[in-house]
Amino acid sequence: MEKYQKATQNPLENVDNVKIESENAIPSNLQAFTKSLAVLDDNVSEFRKRMNHLSATKQILDNFNESFSSFLYGLQINAFCVDYENAPLSESFLLQAKKDQFKATLMTRTGHSISDPPYDGGVISHDPNFATADETFATNDTSFIERPETYSASR
């Protein structure tokens, strides 16, 4: 609060308080404006400090913006350049539409619904009681198991 009061003081209010040694003596301009110039100097130095802080903040934000935009650009280029193995292809959508149509015709003919094979986070059940699942992306090419179990019909 004291800084605010100091900054809002009227710099000309103390001009009349300059001591005059004799009635006929005229104070010099420097003596009359000494306090006003001191207040002005304090305010200008405070303004300079704040502008320096503002400039430093702007530089920090510019550095962040440059780094963050580079990161976003890298993500965008990565999306164009990387071939995602598990991404659905246009044929996958066509196969799903055909599968849904086939299910609908079977349901109208038999009167009951055919459920999807159970999905437990990447492993598709090979239970023969379920309808054939779309195994377009169910490969074990990247598996750490060299010889996976073979499923037999006797299970």
Swiss-Prot record:
Impact when changing residue 143 to A/D: Resistance to thiabendazole
Name of the protein: DASH complex subunit dam1
Post-translational modifications reported in the UniProt record: Phosphorylated by plo1 at Ser-143 during prometaphase and metaphase to promote chromosome biorientation. Dephosphorylated in anaphase.
BP-aspect Gene Ontology terms: attachment of mitotic spindle microtubules to kinetochore; attachment of spindle microtubules to kinetochore; cell division; homologous chromosome orientation in meiotic metaphase I; microtubule depolymerization; mitotic metaphase chromosome recapture; mitotic sister chromatid biorientation; mitotic spindle formation (spindle phase one)
Gene Ontology cellular-component annotations: condensed chromosome, centromeric region; cortical microtubule; DASH complex; kinetochore; mitotic spindle; mitotic spindle polar microtubule; mitotic spindle pole body; nucleus
Phenotype of gene-disrupted mutants: Leads to mitotic defects in a proportion of cells, including an increased time spent in metaphase, abnormal reattachment of chromosomes that have become detached from the spindle, lagging chromosomes, unequal chromosome segregation, and ultimately cut cells (septation without chromosome segregation). Sensitive to thiabendazole, thermal stress, and osmotic stress. Simultaneous disruption of klp6 or klp5 is lethal and leads to the cut phenotype (septation without chromosome segregation).
Organism, scientific name: Schizosaccharomyces pombe (strain 972 / ATCC 24843)
Residues the record lists as Phosphoserine modifications: 143
Keyword line: Cell cycle, Cell division, Centromere, Chromosome, Chromosome partition, Cytoplasm, Cytoskeleton, Kinetochore, Microtubule, Mitosis, Nucleus, Phosphoprotein
Cited Pfam families: DASH_Dam1
Summary of the function given for this chain in its UniProt record: Component of the DASH complex that connects microtubules with kinetochores and couples microtubule depolymerisation to chromosome movement; it is involved in retrieving kinetochores to the spindle poles before their re-orientation on the spindle in early mitosis and allows microtubule depolymerization to pull chromosomes apart and resist detachment during anaphase.
Family statement drawn from the similarity comment of this UniProt entry: Belongs to the DASH complex DAM1 family.
